[in-house]
Amino acid sequence: MFPELPGYPAPKNDNFFLIAGPCVVEGEEITLRIAREIKNICSELDIPFFFKASYKKANRSSLHSFTGIGDEQALAILREVKEELHIPIVTDIHTEGEAVWAAQVADILQIPAFLCRQTDLLVAAAKTGKTVNIKKGQFMSPESMRNAVEKVREAGNPHVMLTERGTTFGYQDLVVDFRGVKAMQENRCPVVLDCTHSLQQPNQPSGVTGGRPDLIETIARAGVAVGFDGLFMETHPEPPKALSDGANMLPLSELKPLLVKLLRIRKAIL
């Protein structure tokens, strides 16, 4: 399935779609650079592309972690990406009050995994009329996400999608149960695999979340093989210098070779 977005018709091919970008808006130049490069890659490969970057990061390990360059400035940069490059925008919200404001720019409002049970937040996002992407909590079963989907639909918005981002495995690790895609697709909505956050290693004593970016290709290949509708990847030209989530990002230079491999898998299973 493909997300229904006004102004962005569904593709005529059967490729998966891609949600990708940096974790957070770091500045105008680098954000536009990343968006432009991903767009060029996806245009060449005929992959539908949605640009994702948070305009603020509310859920951080440490009080001293980077949270953003300023809400208004970050949203203005996302608007520039949207208008200059004609790319649909995905960004996350954390409170009901952010929904209407972020919806002025975003085409898809993303609900963070830790907040996927927050009824008021889901309803507020739904009432904007924008597509709502709910990330499955690390503590939630695939089957239980039906309730989150129903909250959005019963608020009057049929445009909803789900994202798998791993399940807590002990104190400092996550695993992906690939059986879950079938259960989530039974909600008759697009289901996405987050190939980078599902490889996080949270709760580190340092206060900085770790990750296994060396396994991004493994997770992505498995996700395409089992039939996820879309893939989510955070990427950056220099992940070690990224201001958020650098430990589990895909280097931007590795994106195109990976997508080429994934398209071959997609073609083989259709």
Residue ranges: model-predicted function:
Residues 37-40, 44-45, 64-90, 125-131, ...:
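Alpha-helix-loop-beta-strand connector modules within alpha/beta enzyme cores
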Residues 69-70, 84-98, 107-120, 131-142, ...:
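Catalytic beta/alpha-barrel core
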Residues 18, 22-31, 49-71, 236-245:
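Glycine-rich, proline-tolerant flexible connector loops at the mouths of alpha/beta enzymes
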